[in-house]
């Protein structure tokens, strides 16, 4: 009974949450290179994405999604009276691997939460491929990023279905390609039914490392 009451309290607290305000007007679209080497929009799934925004002339403009992240003089605190991050300047190049090392509460996870706009900064600017993240639609911003937490969660279903949760419209071939990029394809092929192997109980029939690889592929 006590657990049910606690669960009910969490559900009602979630229902009482105010919807997020989507302030941005920059969207994410499928893209390709035109004959003149400019980036253009397409309805095809090309594996290439671009930011779409309306220029001063009223025409759509496109910037290829590359993953360039810049923090400029960023201040942030969960409480305005207690700043956790102060005057942070950071440049993450596309394809670069960056490790944040520090004690618990130093703000390592906070930085990733700011990039996703789970929280907004008090001062400064965060740029994503040259665009202020506040000008990007939150759905577009978050769909362009992948977060794999230390504690991963899998669902009852096949390996293929668990990978596809990352993008429900993905084909089997795209899911397999994602698994190869995440270095998960090798162990998946050694499972009893490969990509059709059923996972139950949060993927308890897999090792922690294998669950992490599936989460990365997702």
Predicted regions and their residues:
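Solvent-exposed, non-transmembrane helices and loops of integral membrane proteins
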Residues: 21-32
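ABC-type nucleotide-binding domain
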Residues: 16, 31-218
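Cytosolic ends of transmembrane helices, especially the final helix of ABC transmembrane type-1 domains
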Residues: 1-16
